[in-house]
């Protein structure tokens, strides 16, 4: 019996309308009623997630910013990592050869110097929005992560530039095909979940996790049972071939799996693609 379940949000629980489906909500409530601790592990900001969970009538532990912050169900901070100030300064002052927009995340919000209202569509449920700013107006300390947003091919080229210039001072991951994240060295959902598990007197072997993108890789590979969404990025499926693939997000594949696990955990699971 797993005692904690960790869920990615976009592409795992959140459907195309950026909401959790009713069947999935029902399954999550059943899981909590069965005594399993709910944890939501996402690249989204804490303020964004609190709005989503409040709207959905859910509560649980939060791993946000792809592992840069861990909070309990009341919002009390349990763990955090920030980017080094000198790295933040370097990223903001370097003229990168890219058309990507740059986004910086701090405890007090999401900051960018480019106004792109289309990015707000994914945050309509919570009302979370970016704050337009001049980069030199922000402190260099207290920054969780950067996101670069543009087409995937441009991001692949940008990632090569960043890795060459930063020489192991940060970690990089694709949270979506069009979103490249720069994170503190050694920071990911897997490390954050390990910290949370220790806080709860659990081990990662006591946990199951669900995800669809490369920012889920460490979490999925380290838990007792990692489940890969049918709609997951091909690279994730290729790098974690040992893990079971379940249904797609739009089919509420997490709910289908949880209903099976809660009712017949001893039987082999067969997804409906």
Swiss-Prot record:
Q: Which domain of life is it from?
A: Bacteria
Q: Summarize where Mg(2+) binds, as residue positions.
A: 8, 10, 212
Give the enzyme's EC designation.
3.6.1.-
* Reaction equation(s) it catalyzes: 4-amino-2-methyl-5-(diphosphooxymethyl)pyrimidine + H2O = 4-amino-2-methyl-5-(phosphooxymethyl)pyrimidine + phosphate + H(+)
Matching Pfam families: Hydrolase_3 (PF08282)
- Main enzyme class: hydrolase
**Disulfide bonds, paired cysteine numbers:** none
- Which keywords does UniProt give here? Hydrolase, Magnesium, Metal-binding
**Which GO molecular-function terms appear in the entry?**
4-amino-5-hydroxymethyl-2-methylpyrimidine diphosphatase activity; magnesium ion binding; phosphatase activity
Which InterPro entries does the UniProt entry name for this protein?
Answer: Cof, HAD-like_sf, HAD-SF_hydro_IIB, HAD_sf, HMP-PP_phosphatase
Q: What's the cofactor?
A: Mg(2+)
Q: Which residues form the active site?
A: 8 (nucleophile)
What is the annotated role of this protein in its UniProt record? Catalyzes the hydrolysis of 4-amino-2-methyl-5-hydroxymethylpyrimidine pyrophosphate (HMP-PP) to 4-amino-2-methyl-5-hydroxymethylpyrimidine phosphate (HMP-P).
The family this protein is said to belong to: Belongs to the HAD-like hydrolase superfamily. Cof family.
Q: What is this protein called?
A: HMP-PP phosphatase
Origin organism is Yersinia pseudotuberculosis serotype I (strain IP32953)
């Amino acid at each position: 019996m797993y005692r904690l379940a960790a869920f990615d949000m976009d592409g795992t629980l959140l459907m195309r309308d950026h909401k959790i489906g009713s069947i999935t909500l029902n399954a999550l409530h059943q899981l909590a009623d069965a005594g399993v601790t709910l944890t939501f592990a996402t690249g989204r900001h804490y303020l964004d997630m609190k709005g989503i969970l409040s709207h959905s009538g859910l509560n649980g532990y939060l791993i946000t910013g792809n592992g840069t912050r861990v909070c309990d169900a009341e919002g009390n901070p349990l763990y955090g990592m920030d980017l080094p100030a000198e790295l933040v300064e370097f990223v903001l002052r370097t003229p990168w050869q890219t058309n990507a927009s740059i986004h910086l995340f701090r405890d007090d919000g999401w900051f960018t110097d480019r106004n792109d209202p289309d990015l707000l569509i994914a945050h309509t449920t919570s009302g979370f929005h970016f704050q337009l700013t001049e980069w030199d107006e922000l402190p260099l300390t207290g920054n969780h992560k950067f996101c670069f947003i543009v087409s995937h091919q441009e991001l692949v080229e940008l990632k090569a530039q960043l890795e060459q210039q930063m020489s192991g001072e940060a970690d990089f991951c694709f949270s979506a095909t069009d979103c490249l994240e720069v994170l503190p060295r050694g920071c990911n959902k897997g490390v954050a979940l390990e910290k949370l598990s220790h806080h709860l007197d659990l081990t990662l072997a006591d946990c199951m996790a669900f995800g669809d993108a490369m920012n889920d890789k460490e979490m999925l590979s380290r838990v007792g049972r990692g489940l890969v969404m049918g709609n997951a990025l091909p690279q994730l499926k290729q790098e974690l071939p040992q893990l079971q693939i379940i249904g797609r997000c739009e089919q509420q594949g997490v709910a289908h799996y949880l209903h099976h696990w809660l009712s017949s955990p001893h039987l082999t699971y067969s997804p409906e693609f």
